[in-house]
UniProtKB/Swiss-Prot annotation:
Keywords: DNA-binding, mRNA processing, Phosphoprotein, RNA-binding, Stress response, Transcription. SMART domains: RRM (SM00360). CDD domains: RRM2_NsCP33_like. The gene is blt801. SUPFAM superfamilies: RNA-binding domain, RBD. InterPro entries: Nucleotide-bd_a/b_plait_sf, RBD_domain_sf, RRM2_NsCP33-like, RRM_dom, SLIRP/GR-RBP-like. One of its GO terms (molecular function) is RNA binding. It comes from Hordeum vulgare. Residues 89-161 have a biased composition (Gly residues). This is Glycine-rich RNA-binding protein blt801.
């Protein structure tokens, strides 16, 4: 049987909110296995969202119901069930297959958003996205081409040759 995770997404967080304060806020709804604020890998600063993993589905659902739209550290937060970490790509602003601006060359990927990433980027596999470093599909600043990307990756070519 596959491991089941009862994880919720928490958005709209203050940059000052840390893993411990996130856990403290959600632990009243059930057993919290993990709490994680997502940070920018270059600056180390919070990206304004995180995840809380519960021991049970019931605890996760109670937390979502109770905390969505509530104040945490002076900000109204958004809480919903996290999407599973599958590698089937697509999604985001602009969606898969070109994204904002479409493909820039005959190769797959290019454009702002890239194929499979979209604005904000996909985290698994081809695509990249605006500023994404994960995946290799291009996009603005993406991992395999695109403006600011690496030369010669699997993607839509570089903005400048």
């Amino acid at each position: 049987m596959a491991d089941v995770e009862y994880r919720c997404f928490v958005g709209g967080l203050r940059w000052a909110t840390d893993d411990q304060s996130l856990q403290n806020a959600f632990s009243k709804y059930g057993d919290v296995i993990d709490s994680k604020i997502i940070t920018d890998r270059e600056t180390g600063r919070s990206r304004g969202f995180g995840f809380v993993t519960f021991a049970s589905d019931e605890a996760m659902r109670q937390a979502i119901e109770a905390m969505n739209g509530q104040d945490l550290d002076g900000r109204n937060i958004t809480v919903n069930e996290a999407q599973s970490r599958r590698s089937d790509g697509g999604g985001g602003f602009g969606g898969g297959g070109g994204g904002y601006g479409g493909q820039r060359r005959e190769g797959g990927g290019g454009g702002y958003g890239g194929g499979g990433g979209g604005y904000g980027g996909g985290r698994s596999g081809g695509g990249g996205g605006y500023g994404s470093r994960d995946g290799g599909g291009g996009g603005y600043g993406g991992g395999g081409g695109g403006y600011g990307g690496s030369r010669g990756g699997s993607g839509g070519g570089n903005w400048r040759e």
